[in-house]
Amino acid sequence: MGGGTPQENNGTDLLFFTNTHTHKVDELAHDPHVNLSFVNAVGEWASVAGSAAVVTDRELVKRHYTPTLRAWLGDLEDGTHDGSENDPRLGMIRVRMETATCSLSGKGVFGTVKDVVAGAVSGRVACVAKLREISRAEVDLWRTTEMA
């Protein structure tokens, strides 16, 4: 569902809105292991491994609710299932990060192209990105560190 990606615990827990009356809720109850992948326009990416749980806490839903979520639920015109923050179908999936891998360049498109061309001319392998593994211990430390 849309609505952005709210975060908790210094960004180590990601929240996604969901319709709790769907099969994915049953699937997560059976096997909570998930992997999320993200990529940006310059090809940098992140892969997050973790566990997911469905959360129906109304206060949490209300805190992150945006009216655009109605487009994903619809109004059943029964006075209850209206796509609002009070719609009982609306819940959240909390993904608790366990480990992550990311590939970051920090160079942008032109910097990457420059490195590829230089590699092609010199015969050296182009270094277009740095691969970073984030361990469970690092995630746990990140989760509990006070951020300014």
Report each predicted region and the residues it spans.
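A generic structural motif
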Residues: Q7-N10, V54, T99-T101
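Short amphipathic beta-strand/extended segments with alternating polar/hydrophobic composition
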Residues: M1, V48-S51, T112-D115
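C-terminal edge-of-domain segments
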Residues: G83-A148
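A short, sequence-level motif marking secondary-structure junctions
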Residues: G4-T5, S51-V55, K107-V109
